[in-house]
Structures are given as structure tokens and as C-alpha cells.
């Protein structure tokens, strides 16, 4: 998958992406990070063809996605978004929606890979458990695992994780991240992330700022460069440490939660 010198604007007088150029090799994981408004989510919308590019091209296996029907393109890509949409039906139905013709064994195997099978099996009604409107009967982490299982079952050529863990607490995020690492192994994967701790194992990290790629490389390389990525990393590590200290103080009774 490749973005070739892509430019894009939602409005004619305000360009969002400026010459974005990168390749995600088959079976590798590329992460895109950057501040809010940098254009990260725009990249996922373009890949899914909610919008077409103004200049340049997006290709999959060398073919311009503008020459592919939206139906076949979206069959090629499996997305796990930040806000998972679940139907007011059973857990089984919500997973099987990824590929309705799948067998029960395939649905349960997808759930195992997403690390939700044991939880579902422990419920009185198991896979027949109703999730409620928009999945309100499940926690945020459980909903994301259902979404991951659904995407695994779909067996897409490309995986897209669009801020898939950003709305979760730190502990749940770590657990979900372990699932994502397992699922994305040897698959062509694009990860759009806010928390840098979730993408340190990526083969390549792209740092997007004001619609331009300003840095690229592996996690260790970007830290050595001591540029935009390194500053973002330090800020997030300091914030995480402060949060941990505060939680410890509350647990020790030195502070009371407000």
C-alpha cells in the first residue's frame, strides 16, 4: 500500500495534506502519529475512499484505488476505529458480521485471537449474550475486542487501526495492544495513534505535523534524532508518570479523589 505525493483539501482555500508520501510494505506495520489536526484521520478517510485525493495517488498492489469500486476496496481493508459500532444483538452476531458465512468455529477462533473468547464463554448466555444498544452492556475494552474479532474474521488484506485504543484507560489499552500486536503480525497494517506507547514496535513510524511528514523511522531512531517525536514521547512519559504518582497517592490515602 502506498501514498504517492498525496495532497488533499476539504475546502479549496485550506489544504490538509501536503505531498504525503510513504509505503507500507506487505506484512509490515506502519504507524502515523502527530498532534490533533495534523491530518492523521484524513489519511484513513482517504484510504477508505470517503474522499478522493486532489493530487498524487493512493495505490494498493500498484493499483490506484480510484480505479477500484468502493465495495471491493472496503472488502480489502479491515478497520478498528476509536468508536466501535455494535448492533443491538448477540456477541456472536456482532463478530460474525465481519463475514456472515463464517462457521461457528471460525467465529470462536477470531474471538480467541482477540482475547475475548474466555470472557464470552464465562457469561451465562455465552455468545448469545445481547450487547445492548451500541454495546452499552459491554465495557470499552470488551467492545474493542469484539471489533477486533470482527475484523480478524473478515480476513482483510490490510488492517487499519484508527485511534483504536485512545478512548480506553491505560491498563485496558495495554491489554488491547497485546491483542493488536498478535493480530497484526505478518499483516499489512496501518496504525493511526495518539499514545506513542502503543506503536513503539512498528516497523516504521511517520510523524505528521500540519499535513506534512516531518520525521520517519523506527522508535529508537526517532528518539536518537531528538526531534518532534522525541519531544512528544517525553511529554507523554512525564504525563503517564504524573498520573501513576497521583494514583499511588490516592491509593495510599494521601489524597482523596474529587
Locate the predicted segments by residue.
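ABC-type nucleotide-binding domain
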Residues: 1-258
Amino acid at each position: 500500500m502506498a501514498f504517492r505525493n498525496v495532497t488533499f483539501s476539504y475546502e479549496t482555500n485550506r489544504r490538509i495534506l501536503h505531498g504525503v508520501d510513504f509505503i507500507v510494505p506487505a506484512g509490515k506495520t506502519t504507524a502515523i502519529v502527530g498532534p490533533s489536526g495534523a491530518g492523521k484521520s484524513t489519511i484513513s478517510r482517504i484510504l477508505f475512499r470517503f474522499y478522493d485525493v486532489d493530487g498524487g495517488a493512493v495505490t494498493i498492489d500498484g493499483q490506484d484505488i480510484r480505479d477500484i469500486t468502493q465495495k471491493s476496496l472496503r472488502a480489502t481493508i479491515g478497520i478498528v476505529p476509536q468508536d466501535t459500532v455494535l448492533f443491538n444483538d448477540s456477541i456472536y452476531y456482532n463478530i460474525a458480521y465481519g463475514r456472515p458465512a463464517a462457521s461457528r468455529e471460525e467465529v470462536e477462533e477470531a474471538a480467541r485471537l482477540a482475547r475475548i473468547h474466555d470472557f464470552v464463554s464465562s457469561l451465562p448466555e455465552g455468545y448469545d449474550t445481547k450487547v445492548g444498544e451500541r454495546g452499552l452492556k459491554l465495557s470499552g475494552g470488551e467492545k474493542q475486542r469484539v471489533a477486533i474479532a470482527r475484523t480478524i474474521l473478515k480476513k482483510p488484506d490490510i488492517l487499519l487501526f484508527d485511534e483504536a485504543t485512545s478512548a480506553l484507560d491505560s491498563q485496558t489499552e495495554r491489554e488491547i495492544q497485546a491483542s493488536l500486536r498478535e493480530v497484526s503480525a505478518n499483516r499489512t497494517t496501518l496504525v493511526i495513534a495518539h499514545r506513542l506507547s502503543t506503536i513503539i514496535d512498528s516497523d516504521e513510524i511517520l510523524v505528521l505535523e500540519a499535513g506534512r511528514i516531518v520525521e520517519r523511522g523506527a522508535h529508537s531512531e526517532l528518539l536518537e534524532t531528538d526531534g518532534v517525536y522525541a519531544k512528544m514521547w517525553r511529554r507523554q512519559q512525564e504525563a503517564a508518570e504524573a498520573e501513576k504518582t497521583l494514583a499511588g497517592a490516592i491509593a495510599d490515602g494521601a489524597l482523596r479523589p474529587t
